[in-house]
A protein has these predicted regions:
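RNase H-like, metal-dependent nuclease domains and their acidic two-metal-ion catalytic environment used
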Residues: 6-8
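C-terminal accessory helical subdomains adjacent to catalytic cores in phosphodiester-
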Residues: 1-3, 12-40, 45-196
C-alpha cells in the first residue's frame, strides 16, 4: 500500500477524505490514507510558511506522498492557486473548481437519492452561476426537497454517509467535472494500479 497524507482546505474536504467510502475506494486503488488528515482551516492558510508546521505533523505518519486539496473559490484560475501554495514538500495539489460542493452536484446518483428525484442531472456542476453551495439550495427548492441546511460540514457528512453514498468515481465520470476526474486520476496514478 502507498501511504498518502492529506492537507485539506477545510472541514468539508476533511469529511470527504476521512469518510468510510473514500477510504474504501482508496484502499481498492492501493492507497492508505494517513492519519491525521490535516485541516488548514481556510485556503489562506495554504501558504508555504503556514504549510511547514502542517507537514511536520503529517510526516509523523511517514507518507509516501502528500496531497493538498483546496477550492478555487474566487481565484482567477487553477494555476494562480497552485502558484500561491506550491511547496517542494507536496507531491500533488488538487483544486476543486469553485468549491467541493461542485463534486457533490456531479455525483448524479447521490444527488438523486438526496432529492428523491430520479431524473436529476446537473449539466455543468463546475460552471454554476454562483457558488455550488447556492446551486444545491436552488435544486432542492426546485425539486421540493429540504435544502442542504446552513452547515456545509453537516451536509458533507450526509453526502459522504451511508444514506447518500457520494462516490468520487461517479463525480469523476461526470462529463463536466474535470477537477474531480483530475483528483481521482492523480490518486490512481499514485497507487500504481490500473483504473477500473
Amino acid at each position: 500500500m502507498v501511504k498518502v497524507g492529506f492537507i485539506v482546505e477545510g472541514d468539508s474536504e476533511k469529511v470527504l477524505i476521512e469518510s468510510a467510502g473514500f477510504k474504501k475506494w482508496a484502499g481498492s486503488q492501493g492507497l492508505e490514507i494517513c492519519s491525521p488528515v490535516i485541516n488548514a482551516k481556510g485556503g489562506g492558510n495554504l501558504l508555504p510558511h503556514h504549510i511547514k508546521p502542517m507537514l511536520a505533523q503529517i510526516e509523523r505518519s511517514q507518507p509516501d506522498h502528500i496531497v493538498i486539496l483546496t477550492d478555487l473559490e474566487d481565484a482567477a484560475d487553477v494555476e494562480t492557486v497552485k502558484a500561491r501554495i506550491t511547496t517542494e514538500h507536496t507531491n500533488l495539489i488538487f483544486i476543486a473548481v469553485k468549491a467541493l460542493e461542485a463534486w457533490f452536484l456531479a455525483d448524479t446518483d447521490a444527488m438523486r437519492r438526496w432529492l428523491n428525484a430520479p431524473e436529476f442531472f446537473e449539466t455543468a456542476p463546475e460552471q454554476t452561476p454562483g457558488m455550488p453551495w447556492d446551486r444545491l439550495k436552488e435544486v432542492a427548492k426546485a425539486h421540493g426537497s429540504r435544502g442542504p441546511g446552513s452547515n456545509k460540514v453537516i451536509f458533507a457528512k450526509k453526502m459522504c454517509g451511508v444514506a447518500l453514498r457520494y462516490e468520487l468515481d461517479r463525480a469523476a465520470a461526470h462529463p463536466a467535472c474535470p477537477s474531480a476526474k483530475a483528483f481521482r486520476d492523480g490518486l490512481v496514478a499514485l497507487g500504481g494500479m490500473p483504473w477500473s
